[in-house]
């Protein structure tokens, strides 16, 4: 079992009587799923349907917390305030003390979580939740004080967790999980192209959200020409970006990688005859 301590220092808090309805009208997932014991994953798109932000959400009473990548906090905060208009909400940035990833087989049991996507608990020493995208990505831990951080480090020591971010990256790529920074997705990616439909970021039944029209049209028309896949080579290590060829034809390019595995945006009509193993394309 493994852990990694991120350099993350800020999350966003939205509170007020219109908090749920405000988010419901702009993000791709359904805020009605956001219970006190459940975290969800969602995105905020441009009106043209391209990805601007992705984030986890969890709720504590009348407060909703958005947990984006650190590089996206400022832009997301600005965008939320732009859309706020007359909504009776308060949007603020909240400092945190530390942020951990725990991952590996049955890792959730260490902190008393079930093997359930998005399960959330506020413990006496931290906020913890299973990653709602894919259970193989383990759990996330937010500490608000040095005291909480010390408690988590005691658990790391007692359970003999190994610090290894490379193992996390390997798991992310093998499960075809895009990363907005590493895969260069900001304002470049459509959700259906980059596997967001399969990592619990979209609710098709919730009603309108920003960028919905473009996203729904792509789904209904089946107009995708390229899609994100996990690829693997037994003969080389990948780079990113790197052109991917099959029978001397360019079929796509990598977006992020770890040694001999990578995420790659590939032409759908060019991969039908390529060998696959457990949904991984062998190049």
What spans do the regions from the language model cover?
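Basic, glycine/lysine-rich polyanion-binding surfaces/domains
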Residues: 1-205, 209-283
